[in-house]
Swiss-Prot record:
Its main location: cytoplasm. GO terms for biological process: ribosome disassembly. The gene is infC. It comes from Neisseria gonorrhoeae (strain ATCC 700825 / FA 1090). InterPro entries: T_IF-3_C_sf (IPR036788), T_IF-3_N_sf (IPR036787), Translation_initiation_fac3_CS (IPR019813), Translation_initiation_fac_3 (IPR001288), Translation_initiation_fac_3_C (IPR019815), Translation_initiation_fac_3_N (IPR019814). The keyword 4Fe-4S does not apply. Belongs to the IF-3 family. It is found in: Cytoplasm. This is Translation initiation factor IF-3. Monomer.
């Protein structure tokens, strides 16, 4: 039962008759019986850890298992820390967005793209503006043209209820 919880079998949990043994320093000690390997581990006051159970014979190493587990956890945490979570930022426009507001929104979109985030550009129609959807399409087309050198369009403008939506992702370097 305990063996399934751990990623590696240690000491008495190793079921093979013979193992390929590696010392603490990484030196190959050859193929030895499990009893012999366990005796060596006990003599050096370390654990016998099965590193590669699928090999024939299985590869085991003499090491401090607690220290090994700690280093594995540290490696896992480091890998997790280095992964960047891509976020989706949303910028909302209206069909009547003025030039000054447009420039500010474009500056924000550029900043989000520079940070590596995706941007969802939403154009919201209210009331009678629904009759002038071509104005919205023109505005999103302008956004697309202004961002041509820094972004790629992930999903082209499409209507979703009362809003037109377009997804933009940073260009791959």
């Amino acid at each position: 039962m305990i063996a399934q919880e751990r990623e590696a079998r240690i000491n008495g949990e190793i079921t093979a008759k013979e193992v390929r043994l590696i010392s603490e320093s990484g030196e190959q000690l050859g193929v030895v019986s499990v009893r012999e390997a366990l005796a060596m581990a006990e003599g050096q006051d370390v654990d016998l850890v099965e590193i590669s159970p699928t090999a024939k014979p299985p590869v085991c190493k003499l090491m401090d298992y607690g220290k090994y587990k700690y280093q594995q956890a540290k490696k896992r945490d480091e890998a997790k820390k280095n992964q960047k979570q891509v976020q989706i930022k949303e910028i909302k426009f209206r069909p009547g967005t003025d030039e000054g507001d447009y420039q500010i929104k474009m500056r924000n979109i550029n900043r989000f793209l520079a940070d590596g985030d995706k941007v969802k550009v939403t154009l919201r129609f209210r009331g009678r503006e629904m009759a002038h959807q071509q104005l919205g399409a023109q505005l999103l087309e302008r956004v697309k043209e202004d961002l041509a050198e820094v972004a790629q369009i992930e999903s082209f403008p499409k209507m979703e209820g009362r809003q037109m939506v377009m997804m933009i992702a940073p260009k791959k370097k």
